[in-house]
Regions:
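C-terminal-of-GTPase-core extension/linker across diverse P-loop GTPases
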Residues: 2-12, 54, 144-203
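A glycine-rich (often HGG/GG-containing) alpha/beta subdomain
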Residues: 1-146, 150, 154
Length: 203
C-alpha cells in the first residue's frame, strides 16, 4: 500500500482535543509540509513517539492552529507503516481545514476501519484483534469493554492458534496419504481423528 490515508480519529464534534491521523509511505514529510515546528525537527530527524509543538497550516498556508505532531516509523506503528498524528484543538473547522490541506498535498480520505485493516494486512494484529478494535469502540458497558480489551490483547488468538495448528496437522496427514499412496506413511485411524476434533472442540 503506497498511498497515504488521512482521517479525523476523534470525531468532528467540538472538543478540547482533536486528532488527525495519517498512514502510508511518505506521510511524515507530507505532515511536515503543513506544519512548522518551533524547534529544529525535520521529517528526517524527528524522533518517534515524541510530541513536538508547532504551527498547523491550511491549504493556503495560513496558520490555523498551534498543534502537536508525533510520528511512528514502520514497522513499529499501529498500522505497520509510517504514521503521523496531529493533536490540535478540537474545532470541527480546524480539523476539516487540516484534512483539506493534507488532501491538497496528496493524501486521501481513509475508508471506514482502514487504519485497522492496514494493521491486519501488515501483520500487526490478527483477525480477532482487528474485530476487538470494533467491539471496544462500540462497547456500551465496562464489562463489554473489558472483554474487548482482553481480545485486543490477543487472548482469543492464543486460544485459536493451537486449535488451528492441530487441525492443520490432521488435514496435512490426510493430504499426504491421498497424494502419496505408495509412500510409507502411517495411516490415521478414525479414533485418532475423532480424538483430535473432540480436543479442539473442548477448547
Amino acid at each position: 500500500m503506497s498511498d497515504i490515508i488521512a482521517a479525523v480519529s476523534t470525531g468532528r464534534l467540538v472538543s478540547a482535543i482533536g486528532i488527525v491521523r495519517l498512514s502510508g509511505e511518505g506521510c511524515i514529510p507530507l505532515a511536515f509540509s503543513v506544519f512548522t515546528p518551533r524547534g529544529q525537527a525535520t521529517a528526517k530527524t524527528v524522533e518517534d513517539r515524541k510530541l513536538i509543538l508547532g504551527a498547523l497550516h491550511d491549504r493556503q498556508g495560513r496558520i490555523i492552529d498551534e498543534a502537536m505532531l508525533t510520528v511512528s516509523r514502520a514497522p513499529h506503528s499501529y498500522t505497520g507503516e509510517d504514521t503521523a498524528e496531529f493533536h490540535c484543538h478540537g474545532s470541527p473547522a480546524v480539523l476539516s481545514a487540516a484534512l483539506e490541506a493534507l488532501f491538497a498535498k496528496g493524501a486521501r480520505q481513509a475508508g471506514s476501519g482502514e487504519f485497522t485493516k492496514r494493521a491486519f494486512l501488515n501483520g500487526r494484529m490478527d483477525l480477532t484483534q482487528a474485530e476487538a478494535v470494533i467491539d471496544l469502540i462500540e462497547a456500551e458497558s465496562a464489562e463489554a469493554a473489558a472483554n474487548a480489551a482482553g481480545q485486543l490483547g490477543g487472548a482469543m488468538g492464543k486460544k485459536i492458534t493451537p486449535v488451528y495448528d492441530r487441525l492443520t496437522d490432521v488435514l496435512a496427514h490426510f493430504h499426504a496419504e491421498l497424494d502419496y499412496p505408495d509412500e510409507d506413511i502411517d495411516p490415521l485411524v478414525l479414533s485418532e481423528v475423532e480424538a483430535a476434533v473432540a480436543h479442539c472442540a473442548g477448547k
